Regions:
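PLP-dependent amino-acid enzyme catalytic core
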Residues: 1-244
């Protein structure tokens, strides 16, 4: 929806957000002292929710809309496991069956993440797997393939297209995911107001972009509409930079 500046959060999603939101905005006095800076430094802590990351902010509305459309299953890929865990949790709350393909090498390195997904009732497979044609083709060509997000996405999409009443979900990158994540920045804006502050700089990590957008976009609108001069910094990994 690009026609409206504001889109209501469905009441049922708001109720589930209330399980863990709002998340803390914390002033980092120790960091200020260590840097010997006159600046006031705040950080928005999204790790305090049940899944430990911002991903649940989008998993809940995605599962809500799938349920509204009559779906019974959701599928996705996950790398480190944060999105897979979030989707598994949200699917459980909405009575959906979740199937998660996790990058095989990551699944081996982080076994507890897949345990969390299974705790919430999800089916979890290391990708590439033998459960899809895409996975079988990859393993046939390269039996020791460590997996990648590309292999996991291929398998998740194949399952979604071959399973009745099943939707493929994605935890970052897409417009609707960034929209869901703006709950972070909208909260931060109100919390800064309560503290009597307004940011000169907004800094956020940038992987797929939804966390950065979620924090930054609500403040960006004041630059556009109200003449604010806030600077926005996307902190990307040097190993796989998405912007530069």
């Amino acid at each position: 929806d690009t026609q409206h500046a504001w889109i209501d959060i469905p009441e049922e999603v708001r109720d589930k957000y209330a399980y863990y939101r709002s998340t803390p905005l914390v002033r980092a006095y120790g960091l200020e002292e260590a840097l010997d800076t006159p600046a006031h430094i705040y950080f928005k802590n999204e790790s305090t929710n049940p899944l430990g990351s911002h991903k649940i902010n989008s998993a809940l509305p995605q599962c809500y809309y799938c349920k509204q459309e009559g779906d019974t299953n959701v599928t996705t890929e996950t790398g480190a496991g944060q999105w897979g865990a979030a989707l598994s949790y949200a699917a459980k709350l909405y009575g959906l069956e979740a199937a998660v393909y996790q990058v095989k090498i990551s699944m081996q390195q982080k076994p507890y993440r897949s345990a969390i997904m299974r705790t919430f009732g999800a089916t979890v497979e290391g990708s590439p797997s033998m459960s899809t044609r895409a996975g079988k083709d990859i393993i046939t060509r390269e039996p020791n393939h460590p997996g990648s997000l590309g292999t996991a996405i291929s398998e998740a999409i194949e399952l979604a297209t071959t399973t009745p009443h099943c939707k493929y979900t994605l935890g970052s990158v897409l417009n609707h995911v960034a929209l869901h994540q703006t709950v972070i920045g909208l909260e931060a804006e109100k919390q800064m107001e309560m503290a009597g502050e307004y940011p000169d700089e907004v800094i956020a990590c940038f992987g797929g972009g939804s966390n950065f957008g979620g924090l930054a976009f609500p403040f960006m609108r004041h630059n556009i509409l109200d003449g604010k001069k806030t600077t926005f910094v996307a902190a990307e990994p040097s190993s796989c930079p998405k912007l530069t």
